């Protein structure tokens, strides 16, 4: 709730947890999705269910990240593959959250969290710029603020509380298209459900295409992985390649939506 409040107030809210904590945050995640505000939730996965294996690693929360909210509540999901990759994917989670006005789930796990590797720390000038655009006034010809009027990315405006002329309703009850007024109309609800899904799907236009990590693009066998299995899979594939096997490896970082060319690979 504090992270949601930070995002509502114009900062980027970020919270970290593990599987059981994700279960407890389910209702709040649904609220953040309905509010359509930028937020990052990091799930450092461990063995489950319940208390499970709290000191052991497991990649068991992917379906929870996809569907672990009531109703139809799509949230983008990305995953780090190595300790150094955590920085890049955390940065990417913030970028997606801000530019697309949505909560983002970043998956890691105990293996990555307890791992280490050499890594060159990037300078600020080396990082891509994240564009932050706060709504500060009504646009020319705009008679009243429409908090759910969308841009080309289907993202709504980010209006800071207290900005004169931009007062609007906020909360978990379904909103009317564009006006943000409370609406129980079934046709509007269907429209908004599809709109929120379309917004997440459209993120695929703004993420990198999938690449082959090792091996030929036309190999006979493709090993597909995600998360902390990266090093293990790569080592196994390289060993098979040294034996003359036609094996390739690709590792997915963008779990929802997938890169647009993933099916072609």
Question: Where do the language-model regions lie?
Answer:
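A short small-residue
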Residues: 71-74, 176-177
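A general structural-boundary detector
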Residues: 52, 73, 80, 183, ...
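Thiamine diphosphate
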Residues: 1-67, 76-97, 242
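Short, flexible turn/loop "capping" segments at secondary-structure junctions
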Residues: 68-71, 215-216
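Flexible, low-complexity linker and terminal segments
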Residues: 89, 94-265
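A generic, residue-level signal for flexible/boundary positions that often mark functional hotspots
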Residues: 16, 72, 249-252
